[in-house]
Amino acid sequence: MWVWGVVVGLSLLPFFQFFKKGDPHQLAAIAELENSIDDVLLTDEAEWFQMWKTSGIHQEVYGVPYYSQLDSLTGYGFRECFDSAAAMVAAFHRVVQSQDTYRIRRRKHGDTTEVHAQVSTLQSFGLNAEFRKNVRVEDIEIEIDAGRPLMVGWLHKGDFTKGNPAVCDSEGCGHWSVIIGYDKDDFIAMDPMGKPNMQHGGHDTTKSGELIRMSRPAFYQRFLIEGEASGWAIFVDR
């Protein structure tokens, strides 16, 4: 006796409707699906991707942990935003499990405030890390579209409401955060210092900097100091 079986294809839509951010099983399933898809469908020129971008749905990289620089065991967390930002990206790429582990390695390469020390540390973990100081907003979006968070350096001091520009001051010059997403109005970031006040400058350290939103107009003024292709960022890939 013959038994006929009918193979019914799965519809992908229900799976993504009930996606749980951070669920390891779902992330593994998506990775498996990605590996089985033709390369031509995984380019930023693919028709489905262009439709996705114009739909108004924001782009976000999942799986980036949040580290507060003020939790540093060194006692100097107030000046270690660069370490914490780099550690978040390194942890996303699964080469470290804590910011203190990252910091121990970084000390071999230089001071926390030095770009070359951070780039060298990331490279020592086997990552491809590149510092650029001619970054455009589009470059940030391209990196997020590719599924990679990136570190951005920006001027967090200066009160726009008083007509002041973004500035450096006696306490330091610049701050590093990790951008993990964007939509038409904001960039989504992990800020190791806490919640930034994009209009008045500075941070509220009593509030978490996890998944904060930075309005595009305010971020542009603090990131693109010398023109539309003048931003500082570190791009990291495996």
Which ranges hold each PLM region?
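Noncatalytic regulatory segments and standalone regulatory/sensor domains
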Residues: 22, 54, 108, 170-171, ...
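A structural signal for well-ordered alpha-helical scaffolds and beta->alpha junctions
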Residues: 82-83, 111-115, 133, 172, ...
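Structured segments of extracytoplasmic/periplasmic soluble domains
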Residues: 88-96, 121-128, 143-147
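Mid-length scaffold segments of soluble, non-membrane domains
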Residues: 113-114, 120-135
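Active-site-adjacent structural segments surrounding the nucleophilic cysteine of cysteine proteases
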Residues: 4, 9, 13-112, 183, ...
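Active-site-adjacent substructure of cysteine-protease-like catalytic cores
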Residues: 133-194
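Extracytoplasmic/secreted envelope proteins and their assembly/folding machinery
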Residues: 82-90, 99, 115-119, 137, ...
